[in-house]
């Protein structure tokens, strides 16, 4: 128990990082755990969901999160909100009231482009057992972001395929990736 407690402390301080199930490595200067500072709008949406549906699981991915990795910077933000399937209609109704004209429910790529709006919220179904954020459960982990990028048809339309090598190289060379988390989520997708 003492060893487990010490290991948790080292992980929390960032001296050691988790790279898989029961697998850890000493954090070097070159690689770190992924963190993103969420926009005020993302925090507002998260707060509204926590207040209205305290037990619901959800994640928020901001399109501008990719700016760290892409060659051509994204000037406009879109929130991709994934929520549990059972409650998606209720969440849609809530957000539609609070953000009129800015919410799309599981749009096709054609609908996305037709109704695109800066600051738009795209609502879709959360894959069961999706990785939860480390600081906040609703934060999107890098592992989820990478898997969604190659498996979500809407994201494939939004992000140019020519950006994929830079995104993958930047993510894999700059951040510690929990491989078991990545592959487990990829199997679920």
What are these regions (language model features)?
Residues 1-12:
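Short amphipathic alpha-helical interaction segments
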Residues 11-21:
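A short, conserved structural fragment
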Residues 22, 38-117:
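Short gly/ser-rich loop at a beta-strand->alpha-helix junction or flexible surface loop bordering the NTP-binding
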Residues 22-29:
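Minor-groove-contacting beta-hairpin "wing" of winged helix-turn-helix DNA-binding domains
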Residues 25, 80-82, 122-124:
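Residues in well-ordered beta-strands of folded domains
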Residues 30-38:
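Short, charged/polar, Gly/Pro-enriched secondary-structure boundary elements
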Residues 99-189:
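Hydrophobic alpha-helical interaction segments
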